[in-house]
């Protein structure tokens, strides 16, 4: 299981831990990832993803899980999220047409 957000592609960063005497040692800054179950309105089913807490705020800001996925770029999404996005688009096209 990688330490990468499935919605925003937020990943670990590398930097320095700096002591009081200014000695620098390498360290990793890990994203705050949580396992979340989103409810897709279009699919009417729960979707379980591993996302960052920043992504949770972004999903709320954009108006829900379906709206977030439809506005998101495929380059930022995981393969699982891209497949869910395609299913949502297909379902909405079937309902509209």
UniProtKB/Swiss-Prot annotation:
Covalent S-S links between cysteines: none
Q: Which UniProt keywords apply?
A: Ribonucleoprotein, Ribosomal protein
Query: What Gene3D superfamilies is this protein classified in?
Result: Ribosomal protein L28/L24
Which molecular function GO terms apply here? structural constituent of ribosome
- UniProt key word Endoplasmic reticulum: no
* Cellular component annotations (GO), alphabetically ordered: cytosolic large ribosomal subunit
One of the GO biological process terms? translation
Q: What InterPro entries does this protein's entry cite?
A: Ribosomal_bL28, Ribosomal_bL28/bL31-like_sf, Ribosomal_bL28_bact-type, Ribosomal_bL28_sf
Superkingdom, according to UniProt?
Bacteria
Q: Name one Pfam family in it.
A: Ribosomal_L28
Which residue stretches, if any, does this entry annotate as coiled coil? none
Is Ribonucleoprotein given among the entry's keywords?
A: yes
**Mind telling me which PANTHER family this protein's record contains?**
39S RIBOSOMAL PROTEIN L28, MITOCHONDRIAL (PTHR13528), LARGE RIBOSOMAL SUBUNIT PROTEIN BL28M (PTHR13528:SF2)
The family line of this record is: Belongs to the bacterial ribosomal protein bL28 family.
Report the protein name in the record.
Large ribosomal subunit protein bL28
Tell me which species this is from: Nitrobacter hamburgensis (strain DSM 10229 / NCIMB 13809 / X14)
């Amino acid at each position: 299981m990688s330490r990468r957000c499935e919605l925003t592609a937020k990943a670990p960063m590398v930097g320095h831990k700096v002591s009081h005497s200014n000695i620098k040692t390498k360290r990793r800054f890990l994203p705050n990832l949580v396992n979340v179950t989103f409810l897709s309105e279009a699919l009417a089913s729960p979707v379980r993803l591993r996302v960052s807490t920043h992504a949770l705020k972004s999903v709320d800001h954009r108006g829900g899980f379906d709206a977030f996925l439809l506005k998101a770029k495929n380059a930022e999404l995981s393969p699982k999220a891209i497949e869910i996005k395609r299913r949502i688009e297909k379902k909405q096209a079937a309902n509209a047409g």
